[in-house]
Swiss-Prot record:
The active site is at 270 (proton acceptor). Nucleotidyltransferase involved in the post-translational modification of proteins. It can catalyze the addition of adenosine monophosphate (AMP) or uridine monophosphate (UMP) to a protein, resulting in modifications known as AMPylation and UMPylation. One of its GO terms (molecular function) is ATP binding. ATP binds at residues 109, 111-112, 131, 143-144, 194, 201, 280. It is an enzyme of class 2 (transferase). Belongs to the SELO family. It comes from the Bacteria. This is Protein nucleotidyltransferase YdiU. PANTHER family: PROTEIN ADENYLYLTRANSFERASE SELO, MITOCHONDRIAL. Its EC number is 2.7.7.-, 2.7.7.108. The gene is ydiU. It catalyses: L-seryl-[protein] + ATP = 3-O-(5'-adenylyl)-L-seryl-[protein] + diphosphate; L-threonyl-[protein] + ATP = 3-O-(5'-adenylyl)-L-threonyl-[protein] + diphosphate; L-tyrosyl-[protein] + ATP = O-(5'-adenylyl)-L-tyrosyl-[protein] + diphosphate; L-histidyl-[protein] + UTP = N(tele)-(5'-uridylyl)-L-histidyl-[protein] + diphosphate. InterPro entries: SelO.
Amino acid sequence: MSFSRSEAAPAAPLPDLAATLAAPRDDAFQQLGAAFVTRLPAAPLPAPYVVGFSDDAARMLGLEPALRDAPGFAELFCGNPTRDWPQASLPYASVYSGHQFGVWAGQLGDGRALTIGELAHDGRRYELQLKGAGRTPYSRMGDGRAVLRSSIREFLCSEAMHHLGIPTTRALAVIGSDQPVVREEIETSAVVTRVAQSFVRFGHFEHFFANDRPEQLRALADHVIERFYPACRDADDPYLALLAEATRRTAELVAQWQAVGFCHGVMNTDNMSILGLTIDYGPFGFIDAFDAKHVCNHSDTQGRYAYRMQPRIAHWNCFCLAQALLPLIGLHRDAPSEDARAERAVEDAHAVLGRFPEQFGPALERAMRAKLGLALEREGDAALANQLLEIMDASHADFTLTFRHLARVSKHDARGDAPVRDLFIDRDAFDRWANLYRARLSEEARDDASRAAAMNRVNPKYVLRNHLAETAIRRAKEKDFSEVERLAAVLRRPFDEQPEHDAYAALPPDWASTLEVSCSS
């Protein structure tokens, strides 16, 4: 969602914004009660300063971008004023549970994130959450802080994914501090202001199911349906309809990830959004040299969350959500006994989950057909796309550049093949595939120019490659935030040529292969 400056609401002065956030709130989630949230102020962050800011996210909230320069902005969005807020308006951390790397992990929760309030604009309400705001009752052994490195990565990827058209949480700002924190080495603290209509996760439902709290489970489901899935209210079984919609959104989200070569890295059930958003940017990565078995998370030694595994894991996670919702499914129908209701609930849930492949597969096929510039639907299109991925995998061809350069291929001859062909080690394999591709293009009415234009609207030239983020991070550690701003600006126009920024679209340098990202953020 976006709108022009002229359409935006007048900017609220910072004191008014702070007062709005500090006022007693009516946001529905925190009204669910003490079983769901714990209120506490953020831990003070000394001498905060602005590292990054999203004008676009600000406008989405009805705020003017000039807000970033207002005195006290950094203080407000690292949570420092919250210690002076009334108890009824304090930020809150929510509790949830979940499966981590396929194993039940029990109670988890917002271990370093606090929701400070809601803002309403253009008919929608958005929660504002500070990630890195200090310890909470759910921090376990953590210090409650986020580091500058991971905060910049989350900010940049939130911007990148939104402008790629992929559902995601947003990031309004990154606030830094010189406060040291210990990870694998000494780093500095930062806070990301995350924005979403809701941060409810699969793990919230799992928590109340696992702890046998049916009233809270039903209250949570009713909250999600009432606020985000109102069409489910009128279904024969609202809770089954909720499962169906969440499953569909998840299938379609992961299809979009696969289409741009995005790896999430930590697809635990507590990192799955009930709204089908990309959430919790940690050890993520966009694939450079294509490898279907690519694992972006250095901590994922078993490859559970590899690129090729993401659809299967998403489906598995939906099973976990279904299990948590089973006590609710069928409550609106008359059943001769609780056992009969429960048995029918399992059957109905399995039927919903069985549709996941039917939702994911066509969504990915549509995306791949568009990436190949195919306006017409033909039976062999999926096979053609899969054959391309296979030869890309064999040659470790660059994922993003392969699809971007395919727009130069002509339906008439091989004169435009060189840019993409040069990305392949096995060029004979590419030539064989290109001949099949040209034969398929001959069935299309569009000329090369119009097809190329359409392809360039779906195949990004610019993605957040790890080495680009690393360069911005290294400069930010020296208090030079210009590269964060510059890179964010490039990523906000991923499909545009931007010839002055061609270097951001180039193949990664050799040193990029040594970069590792892990869960230590």
